[in-house]
Amino acid sequence: MAIRTFRPYTPGTRTRVVTDFNEVTGRKPERSLVIAKHRLKGRNNRGVITCRHRGGGHKRQYRLVDFRRNKHGVPAKVAAIHYDPHRNARLALLFYKDGEKRYILAPAGISIGQEVLSGKDVPIEIGNALPLSSIPLGSSVHCVELYPGRGGQMVRCAGSSAQLMAKEGEYVALKLPSTEVRLVRGECYATLGEVGNSEIRNTSLGKAGRRRWLGRRPQVRGSVMNPCDHPHGGGEGRAPVGRAGPVTPWGKPALGLKTRKRNKPSNRFVLRKRRRVSKRSRGGRDS
C-alpha cells in the first residue's frame, strides 16, 4: 500500500494526495452484507441540526461489519479486500467453513487466502480474535471490546492499534492510541494486529469539492457572522473576539476546555490520562 500524487494539471490536483487501491481486490460489495441506510445529515429525530457542517455527498450503502467475532472455533478464509465508504479502513470478506460470509476490519498485513479464527485457544496470528487475557503482553490489538459480548468499540480507525501493557487480576491494562492507559476486562475480545490503510494520514483532498463528496459542508468562521448568529460576530471590519477566549456558537469556552465529567464512574478504569494537545499544535480554527 502506498500513496499517489498528481501533477498540477488543475488547481485541484496540485496538492491532491490519495492512497492507491492496490490492496482492494473486490470491485463490488457482497450483496448479502449490504443494506440501505438513511443519512441523517446532522439532524436528530426532530429534524434539528445537532451536528453542523454535514449533508450532501455521494450515495452510500452500509456494509454490515462483524465487530463481535462470535463464531468461535469456525475457520474462515479471506476471500477479498473491499472498500468501505463509511470508514477509512478497508474490509476483509471472510468465507467461513460452514458457508457464512462476514466482513471484518482488514488488519495490516492480511492476505487473500489467509485463514483466521476466533476463540480462547486460537493461534497468536494477525487477524485472529481472542480474549485479552489470552493475548501476550506487548502485543498490538485493535477492535477492542469495552464490555464482553458487545462487540469491538475502541481502536477501529485506519492505522490504529492498542498495546497490552499489563495484566492485573481480571483486568488488562491497554495503552490506547491517545496515549491513555485504561483497564479493560480480560474476557473482552480483541483482534490481533493493527488496522490497515495506515497511509490515510498522509493524504490530502486537494480541493473543496472532494470534501463535499464526503458529505462535509463548508465551515463558516464565527468572526464573519452577525452578532445574532455567533458570539464572535459583529464589529467593524476584522474585529477581535471581544472575550477572554474563544467560545462556541452557544457561548461555552472552546479550544481546550475539558468536557469529561469529573465523577464519571468509568474514571476508576483510567490509569493514565491521555496526553493533552496544546492549542498551538492543534491549529484550531475560529469556531
UniProtKB/Swiss-Prot annotation:
Keywords on record: Ribonucleoprotein, Ribosomal protein, RNA-binding, rRNA-binding
Gene Ontology biological-process annotations: translation
InterPro entries: NA-bd_OB-fold (IPR012340), Rib_uL2_dom2 (IPR014722), Ribosomal_uL2 (IPR002171), Ribosomal_uL2_bac/org-type (IPR005880), Ribosomal_uL2_C (IPR022669), Ribosomal_uL2_CS (IPR022671), Ribosomal_uL2_dom3 (IPR014726), Ribosomal_uL2_RNA-bd_dom (IPR022666)
One Pfam family this sequence matches: Ribosomal_L2
SUPFAM superfamilies: Nucleic acid-binding proteins (SSF50249), Translation proteins SH3-like domain (SSF50104)
Entry keyword Metal-binding: no
Region (Disordered) residue spans: 221-287
Annotated GO CC locations: large ribosomal subunit
Disulfide bonds: none
Compositionally skewed regions (Basic residues) per UniProt: 258-287
GO MF, one example: transferase activity
Domain of life: Bacteria
Coiled-coil intervals, chain numbering: none
Role this protein plays: One of the primary rRNA binding proteins. Required for association of the 30S and 50S subunits to form the 70S ribosome, for tRNA binding and peptide bond formation. It has been suggested to have peptidyltransferase activity; this is somewhat controversial. Makes several contacts with the 16S rRNA in the 70S ribosome.
Quaternary structure and interacting proteins, as annotated: Part of the 50S ribosomal subunit. Forms a bridge to the 30S subunit in the 70S ribosome.
Family as reported in the entry's similarity comment: Belongs to the universal ribosomal protein uL2 family.
Protein name: Large ribosomal subunit protein uL2
This protein's encoding gene: rplB
